[in-house]
């Protein structure tokens, strides 16, 4: 289901996004310098990265494969004839005075990706966002303002790191759609294994183009919000810029096209410079790099190495396993989590997908988050979690006892069966034993019995709780409910 984004103070919002995603090759796009983050400044740059006279770039073949994977992941036309261009501008962290990019013949052409907006909420909907293009380029260095008092340093470790710049169509009409789009692209590049996409390290950052206009009027003047590297900042920056542009127009002014920065402390955007157009960069073909022709054999090899896409797997989780779109979205938040869930399902059967989803998204994910661990670092393997769920399904233990067993699984290498046996946690299903407990509970809680007989349903829940407490949580809840009603009514 799709839906029309609401107006904001009577204005329609138009948003397009450019994402700069570093590719996770071991060396840079045109040199053999390493790409390890966090090293001492200027220790990972060769003379190629530094722009020494006479040096020649050599293309890293790994970036081609990764870019093709992305193109296939967004259903795009793939550029089999690739050229590189020079984007000319001056900035201290750009040692050559130009950036090598792809202007004329990008490796990824038009495509699309479907996003889920407001996931898990009543107003949840899907929307298709067009991809204009995605092209390869080299990253710039980094200006460092806090290393030396009253001076700015330049760290060129990042210069030459391979990037894929992903340009969307201006198809987003709300803050929520924009954030959902960025999250979906982030999920895809990590799923494909082409980028670590660690936003805090700058390996995945977004430039957001925002404009507003009244319905049935031409699009407004856009402003670009530069270098946003967290989902929270993206949300806040867009919201702030929308409000600013509306205020300018309502006050009788005109929005000036500009590049702006978001100040999170003041929660506002501020002008950085007037926005450049393509001709300001004087693009021309890079004479040092030959065209790259991608063969059918290369395309077939990359396609054969493609994993099942998150969008396809989400659809399978809904249609084949009967999960909600929200559950499918959460479980496919990372390829590792999704694979873990499927491993559990391989053991307990797809008919039990809902209980498996509840345990993976609930107890397991909660414990991982609490301990700041990833799913790959989980002390409980998929096989051991499946063993626990099997014992819930066959009524060996109750759901409440299962949480206790889970805690022991987290702290040890033992199986659920071993823990249940050692701790004496097996569920009590003997009717006679449960009836004996109920007799005592009824005798000691006559007032509660009278309340239930008088029509107070909550009193019955209290009696159930007393029975479960007396059995130390071991009594089968379904049996307790049935026997209680039978014995109270007798």
UniProtKB/Swiss-Prot annotation:
The keyword Hydrolase does not apply. Keywords: ATP-binding, Ligase, Nucleotide-binding, Protein biosynthesis. One of its GO terms (molecular function) is ATP binding. SMART domains: GatB_Yqey. Gene3D superfamilies: 1.10.10.410, GatB domain, N-terminal subdomain. GO terms for biological process: glutaminyl-tRNAGln biosynthesis via transamidation; translation. It comes from the Bacteria. Its EC number is 6.3.5.-. Pfam families: GatB_N, GatB_Yqey. It catalyses: L-glutamyl-tRNA(Gln) + L-glutamine + ATP + H2O = L-glutaminyl-tRNA(Gln) + L-glutamate + ADP + phosphate + H(+); L-aspartyl-tRNA(Asn) + L-glutamine + ATP + H2O = L-asparaginyl-tRNA(Asn) + L-glutamate + ADP + phosphate + 2 H(+). Belongs to the GatB/GatE family. GatB subfamily. Heterotrimer of A, B and C subunits. Allows the formation of correctly charged Asn-tRNA(Asn) or Gln-tRNA(Gln) through the transamidation of misacylated Asp-tRNA(Asn) or Glu-tRNA(Gln) in organisms which lack either or both of asparaginyl-tRNA or glutaminyl-tRNA synthetases. The reaction takes place in the presence of glutamine and ATP through an activated phospho-Asp-tRNA(Asn) or phospho-Glu-tRNA(Gln). This is Aspartyl/glutamyl-tRNA(Asn/Gln) amidotransferase subunit B. The gene is gatB.
